[in-house]
């Protein structure tokens, strides 16, 4: 999360230099990178919509068309995890630094910590469609390409329904490859793997995205569930919303003249929406 503080900030330079280094939080877990656009958070609850597909009818040209509105289903789930963060910020005058600037610092600090809590999210992610593979002698790149082909085929656009009144469903393509240490080591040996180096724009945006292969962003995690080699997914099948439930700034800190005390709580949660958009691969047993 970044902010244009140079235009909106009215405090002193010393305070600004203390706050700015923390506002560009690094996100580590892939759902944090790919927050669904149709998710809202209110308090400790996340709301999202399951949009239904268009109706498709077939018949002679010029026939009367009936309007059928299927609408969308609104659903919700609780954000049952939270992080609290707080501390003393020295040499910051409460009167000269607005609470939104302090709040942004707290939220971004909490963002970095929340993103490190991969285990809960990965456990939920691993509930996707179970797949097995036999490691190719030609390397991990071939395994990835085969897995992408399976994903795209199973998520291709399909017409469902009866007769001439059908609906189009699907159309999702694989966009992300989540790998653990073992499979990542194999992937690095493939010349098709494009590794991103520190300092590149992509790396700066999300430190967990380590490169690209086969048209997919490669996300590295050290906390892959046991037995899972890699996960091929489209982020639309998974939600990881975050929200701030409270932020407070206190003007006086005992024993620290000229300092303020700030604290905040961030709530978050994980939910698998479509198991078929998350393919979880384990090596086939010999």
Where are these regions (language model features)?
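Sequence/fold signature of self-assembling virion shell proteins
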Residues: 2-7, 14, 19, 33, ...
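Short acidic, glycine/tyrosine-flanked loop/strand segments centered on an H-E-D-like triad
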Residues: 70-96
